[in-house]
């Protein structure tokens, strides 16, 4: 089972990405195609003990930057690492692809070379959000589609429910719509119409949920649906707040010798909390609804994130996520309609 990894598009160069690929091969027995500058990647690989039969390097000469126009770049830079990595999936050489680069470019390459699954109106980005207890809440759309129709959001709910159940083992995922109140008629026109659609689908729809419910502080919910404009703001705000809290805590500890002593006693607790809130534990966010499996990572993805991204991609293949999506959307086609 081969997974393609765009090794060149991260913020900090390819070394951490290569290390993550080596760890995935070593710990999970998977195979990885690293796409990027061949000589540079081979030089980095010399630093590690790895199975040469399970890691290969695919040469590419271009890198799509964070400031490049996605739609233009994926066509003009066909030898870029992200495009070549996606094409390995399109050519059936790999079961999925991970890129820590330009999100828009990864999406554009996936749509251009992989295409949508039959019946999918718009592919959403599904981001795992850590909460107080249990598996993460799946937030979608986390940035792929800033303007959505109710039919899009209803499909997002179905795809997110499958992701939560198959990958995180939630037996009967609770699905909610992110809104400005729990009452049935709260929200804008799109969310109210989406509410009516989701009531018709035979799954565990719990109605409207509020922002606090994402983190386990309010209503119990496993999948939260919104458009990509709101979802991306929520995702970035969540990441920023978590980082800020850790910084405040660290700075406060440094100001007092007593606090430093207490911190030493609580070191294992702090480590456990950090691990629970670390995005790297989930690898990245899946672009659901495309042929093949596509995961988008942070530009700052480290070796742990890459290792887990490769693992999650392989688990998606084992659990036949795309087959489940295809089946469920087919079942509910009369409810969801065919609005493009």
From Swiss-Prot:
Pathway: Lipid metabolism; phospholipid metabolism. Keywords: Cytoplasm, Lipid biosynthesis, Lipid metabolism, Phospholipid biosynthesis, Phospholipid metabolism, Transferase. InterPro entries: FA_synthesis, Phospholipid_synth_PlsX-like. Its EC number is 2.3.1.274. Its main location: cytoplasm. Catalyzes the reversible formation of acyl-phosphate (acyl-PO(4)) from acyl-[acyl-carrier-protein] (acyl-ACP). This enzyme utilizes acyl-ACP as fatty acyl donor, but not acyl-CoA. HAMAP family: PlsX. This is Phosphate acyltransferase.
């Amino acid at each position: 089972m081969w997974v393609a990894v765009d090794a060149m598009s991260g913020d900090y160069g390819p070394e951490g990405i290569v290390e993550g690929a080596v760890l995935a091969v070593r710990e999970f027995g998977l195979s990885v195609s690293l796409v990027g500058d061949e000589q540079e990647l081979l030089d980095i690989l010399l630093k590690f003990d790895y199975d040469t039969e399970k890691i290969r390097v695919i040469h590419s000469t271009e890198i799509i930057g964070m400031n490049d126009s996605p739609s233009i770049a994926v066509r003009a830079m066909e030898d870029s690492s992200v495009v070549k990595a996606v094409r390995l999936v399109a050519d059936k050489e790999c079961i999925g692809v991970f890129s820590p680069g330009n999100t828009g470019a990864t999406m554009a390459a996936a749509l251009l070379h992989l295409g949508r699954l039959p019946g999918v109106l718009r592919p959403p980005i599904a981001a795992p959000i850590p909460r107080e207890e249990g598996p993460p809440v799946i937030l979608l759309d986390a940035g792929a589609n800033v303007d959505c129709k109710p039919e899009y959001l209803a499909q997002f709910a179905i795809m997110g429910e499958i992701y939560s159940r198959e990958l995180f083992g939630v037996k009967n995922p609770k699905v909610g719509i992110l809104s400005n109140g729990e009452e049935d008629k709260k929200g804008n026109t799109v969310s109210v119409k989406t509410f009516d659609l989701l009531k018709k689908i035979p799954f565990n729809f719990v109605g409207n949920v509020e922002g606090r419910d994402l983190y386990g502080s309010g209503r119990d919910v496993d999948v939260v649906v919104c458009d990509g404009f709101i979802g991306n703001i929520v995702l970035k705000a969540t990441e920023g707040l978590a980082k800020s809290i850790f910084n405040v805590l660290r700075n406060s500890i440094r100001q007092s010798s007593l606090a430093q002593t207490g911190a030493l006693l609580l070191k294992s607790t702090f480590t456990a909390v950090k691990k629970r809130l670390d995005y790297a534990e989930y690898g990245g966010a899946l672009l659901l609804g495309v042929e093949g499996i596509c995961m988008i990572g942070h530009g700052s993805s480290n070796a742990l994130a890459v290792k887990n991204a490769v693992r999650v991609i392989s688990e998606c293949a084992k659990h036949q996520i795309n087959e489940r999506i295809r089946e469920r959307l087919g079942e509910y086609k009369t409810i969801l309609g065919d609005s493009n």
